């Protein structure tokens, strides 16, 4: 009986290892081209498996992409956590600029986020995973505000407003008609800094 239990544990570990290979293959493709150009056959080829094998681990392409995006965001979240936990926590502007530049510099992450925001027929499991994604940044900004002395109830409400404001700026001006991508990025960051200064004045009185 004990040997059967060990075998089951081993099989589960092997399954999780293979699942992780699929996720890493997906993220590799996301770094090369927009997520909407990535299909299950592309992922299968990158991972060295058949397309049918992918569905043993993920019920749909949507589920795979969300899981990959969540893992990517979770990795980035560690950098934000270090900014928050410093002896002198990051300013609202520093947080905003880092959040903005991450989305601008990681095209597939941004596209996946906006896709999930706008899609109106997400399945229940996908909705739950997307809630987890958005909660990551809501929680991070709330923690930052609490480090700056804002009470928890206010911090939570303002975190929703702040993250929505920043993503709205990026969505509005990402394809703005300027001569270069760098000028667009500079303009977006200027607007983000203005927004951050308003929140700083309102919440921190600075």
Q: Which positions does each model-derived feature cover?
A:
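N-terminal intrinsically disordered/low-complexity leader segments
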Residues: 1-17, 203-206
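Generic hydrophobic, amphipathic alpha-helix propensity
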Residues: 15-27, 43, 68-72, 76
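Helix-turn-helix
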Residues: 21, 29-63, 67
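Hydrophobic alpha-helical connector segments
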Residues: 67, 81-107, 158-162
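Amphipathic alpha-helical packing segments from all-alpha helical-bundle domains
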Residues: 74-82, 123-149, 156-160, 186-189, ...
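Amphipathic alpha-helical segments used for helix-helix packing
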Residues: 104-124, 171-178
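Hydrophobic/aromatic-rich alpha-helical bundle segments in the mid-to-C-terminal region
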Residues: 115, 146-193, 203-206
């Amino acid at each position: 009986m004990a040997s059967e239990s060990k075998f089951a544990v081993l099989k589960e570990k092997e399954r999780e290892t293979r699942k992780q290979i699929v996720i890493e293959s997906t993220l590799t493709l996301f770094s090369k081209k927009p997520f909407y150009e990535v299909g299950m056959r592309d992922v299968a080829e990158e991972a060295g498996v058949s397309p049918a094998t992918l569905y043993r681990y993920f019920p749909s392409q949507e589920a795979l992409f969300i899981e990959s995006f969540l893992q990517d965001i979770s990795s980035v979240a560690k950098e934000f956590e270090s900014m928050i936990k410093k002896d002198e926590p990051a300013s609202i502007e520093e947080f905003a600029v880092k959040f903005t530049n991450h989305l601008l510099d990681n095209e597939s992450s941004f596209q996946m986020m906006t896709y999930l925001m706008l899609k109106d027929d997400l399945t229940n499991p996908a909705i739950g995973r997307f809630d987890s994604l958005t909660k990551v940044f809501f929680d991070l900004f709330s923690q930052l505000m609490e480090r700056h002395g804002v009470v928890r109830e206010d911090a939570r409400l303002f975190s929703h407003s702040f993250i929505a404001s920043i993503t709205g700026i990026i969505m509005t001006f990402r394809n703005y008609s300027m001569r270069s991508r760098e000028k667009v990025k500079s303009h977006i960051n200027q607007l983000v800094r203005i927004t951050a200064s308003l929140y700083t004045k309102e919440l921190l009185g600075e």
